[in-house]
Every structure is written in C-alpha cells, then in structure tokens.
C-alpha cells in the first residue's frame, strides 16, 4: 500500500505501525481433503490426514521472512455404480522460491471400498476408508463375510495423522459398508442382524470415525470425521457420519431419500457410501490449512 508521511508518523507514535519479524514460531493445523464414499452399498470415505502442532505433541515450526506456499486438498468426487470412492488430495504447507522445501504434508483421505472383491476392500490413506460389500447369497441366516477396511496414517507420520476404516459385511440377505476412519478414532464396522422372514439376515452399516477438536482459531471446532457406510437391506440402518463433518451413508430403499451425504466443506471429512447410479455416494469434504502466529494472529 501507499501511506503519507503523516499517517506513518501517527501510526508509529501510537504503536500501530506494522513491524517486521525476523523469525516467528508458527502453530499449524493442516487437514487434507476427505475421500468420497463408494457406490452400491459401499464403505464410507476416510477423513483427510490431520496434522497439528497446536496443543499437540508435534512441535511448532520456526519461519523466517520469505515466501511460503499453501495447498489446500480437495475432497474426492462422488461415485455412482459399483466402484471404489475417490481419494481426497493432499494439503501442503511449504517454503516457496529457492528454498523449495515441504514442511508439512497431510495425506488425502481414502475412497470407500466398493462392490465385489477384490475391489471391495477398503483403501489406505490419511484415514482409511470403510470396507465395501458384495452381492448376497441365498436367503437364510448364516455366517457373514467381513471385508477389511483400509489402513489410516498411510504414509506413516508421528504423531499419527489418521485412523483405520471399519470392515464391511456380506450377510446372507443384505450387505453393508464399513465406516471411514476419522481423525479421532477408527471407523465403525458393519454389524450382522437377525430378522424375521422374509428378510432373515442383513447388516447395519458402520458409522464414520469421530473427528478431532482444535481451538487453534480461538474456539473449539471439530473437523475430519469419517463417512458412514451404506446398506442394502430395507430394514437395516445406514452408517452415521463421524463428528466433525462426516457424511451419512445411503439407505435402501430410496423413494424420496437422499444420496450419500457429502463431507462438510473445509473439514476434510469423508463422504457417505452410496446405493446406485440414482443415489450416488457423498463427496469428500475439502481440507483446510490454518496458521497461528505469535499473539492472536490467525491465517
């Protein structure tokens, strides 16, 4: 900007003129984009990787004067059909210019596990996605097949940036996806149910893992919840989204009911699992990068 001599003199005399800081200790919160839920009774998307130094074991970083780059990860796009969900993209805080170093990278959340093995297995990411499902066998009550959720904290960071997804389930007369992992805890598993004829046996979908709270902006906000799994059976429950913005999974049948719910914007939360091309999965929520400078400045 341009200031007159009078405005500069006045600001300096009042102590309000900006001063250069040679270096400063910066606290950060870097959350990647969340993964989308999978299609067709799929698993919920995993939350984006969650890395912070504020009131956490990780140390603040010291920055000197210079240019820095910030990349905020996008959420994975929604899915219709039987395929896996899409992963979120990474959020990055790094030095620009000739320094060119990356200081903090949070990994995108995993896309939910879809239908039919081997694609039904959950995927790995900042937080892992819920395991998917595959079509049921004959009616009747019998053992259910578990489909593993994906691993969180992939690649590994210390402290951990995320948690695992819950397993999906193929029951004799119904399938359901597992919940995506959240920043606070793992995604919930799908659970087999015993029902009267003609349903016999189905499955309730897993809930998304809880997010994690931070007060880096001055008030406590929970972010990065996992997405809930979807369910096939008409009398079974879809998975709730994890606290902090995770999307709920789709429930069948669908007249008048919504598709899988998207993760909340700027929380890096996972999207809920979908049902079919008419009722797609929920998209993952975009991430966020927050920097807290000395005093009360928040970027």
Residue positions per predicted region:
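Low-complexity, glycine/proline-biased repetitive segments and flexible coils/loops
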Residues: 1-14, 23-299
């Amino acid at each position: 900007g341009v200031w007159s001599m009078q405005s500069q003199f006045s600001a300096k005399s009042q102590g309000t003129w900006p001063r250069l800081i040679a270096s400063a200790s910066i606290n950060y919160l870097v959350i990647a984009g969340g993964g989308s839920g999978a299609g067709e009774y799929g698993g919920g998307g995993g939350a984006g990787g969650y890395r912070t130094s504020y009131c956490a074991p990780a140390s603040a970083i010291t920055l000197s004067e210079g240019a820095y780059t910030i990349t905020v990860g996008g959420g994975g796009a929604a899915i219709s059909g039987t395929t896996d969900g899409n992963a979120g993209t990474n959020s990055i805080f790094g030095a620009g210019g000739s320094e060119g170093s990356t200081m903090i990278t949070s990994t995108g959340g995993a896309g939910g596990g879809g239908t039919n093995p081997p694609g039904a297995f959950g995927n790995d990411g900042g937080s892992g996605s819920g395991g998917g499902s595959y079509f049921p066998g004959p009616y009747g009550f019998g053992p259910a097949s578990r489909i593993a959720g994906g691993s969180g904290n992939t690649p590994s960071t210390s402290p951990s940036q995320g948690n695992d997804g819950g397993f999906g389930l193929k029951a004799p007369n119904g399938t359901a996806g597992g919940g995506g992992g959240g920043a606070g805890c793992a995604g919930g598993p799908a659970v087999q149910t015993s029902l009267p004829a003609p349903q016999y046996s189905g499955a309730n979908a897993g809930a998304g893992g809880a997010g994690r709270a931070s007060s880096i902006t001055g008030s406590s906000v929970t972010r990065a919840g996992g997405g809930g799994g979807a369910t096939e059976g008409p009398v079974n429950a879809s998975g709730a989204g994890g606290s902090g913005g995770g999307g709920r999974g789709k429930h069948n049948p669908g007249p008048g009911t919504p598709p899988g719910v998207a993760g909340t914007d700027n929380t890096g939360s996972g999207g809920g699992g979908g049902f079919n091309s008419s009722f797609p999965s929920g998209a993952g929520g975009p991430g966020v990068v927050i920097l807290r400078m000395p005093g009360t400045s928040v970027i």
